[in-house]
Amino acid sequence: DEVGEEVGRYIRLCNYCSGLCMPEIAAMGALEGLDVMLNDALYGILFRDINMQRTLVDQFMSRVINGFAGVIINTGEDNYLTTADAVEEAHTVLASDLINEQLALLAGLPEEQMGLGHAFEMDPMLENGFLYELAQAQMTREIFPKATLKYMPPTKFMTGNIFRGHIQDALFNMIGIWTSQGIQLLGMPTEAIHTPFMSDRYLSIENARYIFNNMKNIGDEVVFKENGIIQNRAKEVLDKATVLLEKIEREGLFTALEKGIFADIKRPKNGGKGLDGVCAKGKNYSNPFVEIMMNR
């Protein structure tokens, strides 16, 4: 806040509300006035090996607190595309976003506080890859019109060639402004080489500012060709996501996670960290904060 006063603009504070202490961290974030918190049990299950029963229970209360405190949550679907193919598995990202949306609504979180995640992670050598990325981003924006979408930059196919990398980030920024993404994490030209220097971060901000200003209203001016590559790609992804969600509805979310449906990573229902902290609710169990916070 002191730096914000110094530079004359509001700076949002962000932290992670994940692991084995999701509700506790959410409470601390609320007390400290944080603006954004990563809050995603599915990410914890897949990438941090947290037990799925434990973290989904924790996630509910943590999201109740985040919703009450006005904190925007982020979800981690973008990470799926670092381990799975971004073209073939794009529908799993959308399916997970839809699941995460419903889990957030159950916890009383407004749509405007949902930073549902996705990413620009297709192979840059893919023919018409930009059109597929644009289709994915536009589709996500149309399906979640009120959400503060979190859009992640290319990392998987950053080779250390800083010149090509800067162009990849520019294409990513173009799609971000074109499709009105909510939270845009900027790519670094030195991705895959070293932890970014401040000078690298400056170049990334300069890149984004140039494109965001120069292409500010492109999304208002350009319409997509009926049954063209972009529309057909979006339809294909949506259809596959629908089929997958119907399968998950039949089998259950835990079974889907055990089978490695998301991110090509399999996790056992009774494995991972924290299961010993899960117990059945007693008949006299009561948590007054849920009702108070959800009826704010």
Positions of predicted regions on the chain:
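Anaerobic metallocofactor- and corrinoid-dependent redox/one-carbon enzyme cores
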Residues: 1-296
